[in-house]
Regions:
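Structural helix-boundary/capping segments
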Residues: 3-4, 8, 15, 58, ...
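Serine-dependent amide/ester hydrolase catalytic core
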Residues: 1-69, 120-124
């Protein structure tokens, strides 16, 4: 698919999503399909082609793809945690131009347990 055709497809999707979102204030979805991974697991390393890397990323974060393609305002915020204490995120996706609602929702979650006052353990040598 050439660049002009790809842009046309993305624009068509953006218009369809805008129409769909007129019915909803926010769509809530998991940010990732599984708990957070160790750093570097899905990096684009020299031995991995884009054909291999793309599906890895899409499988790990399938719920973020539509917002990325259409430019919808979305925000990932921690809502729970894994057994290892890693944050488990949820993604709010809103209407075009209504980013303020996403920030208000995220602010309310940050004030609620277990995240209120929680800070990571950092060490410097």
């Amino acid at each position: 698919m050439d660049v002009a055709r790809a842009n046309s497809v993305m624009q068509t999707a953006a218009v369809a999503v805008a129409r769909f979102m007129q019915q909803y204030d926010v769509i809530l979805a998991p940010t990732l399909a599984e708990p957070p991974l160790e750093l570097g697991r899905i990096n684009l390393s020299p031995g991995i082609s884009m054909a291999e890397w793309g599906p890895r990323v899409a499988a790990f974060s399938p719920f973020t793809q539509m917002a990325n393609w259409t430019g919808q305002p979305s925000m990932s915020v921690p809502l729970g945690q894994s057994r290892e204490g890693l944050p488990i995120g949820v993604m709010f996706t809103g209407r075009y131009g209504d980013e303020a609602l996403l920030f208000r929702l995220a602010g309310q979650l940050e004030m609620a347990p277990p995240w209120a006052g929680r800070r990571p353990n950092l060490a410097a040598k």
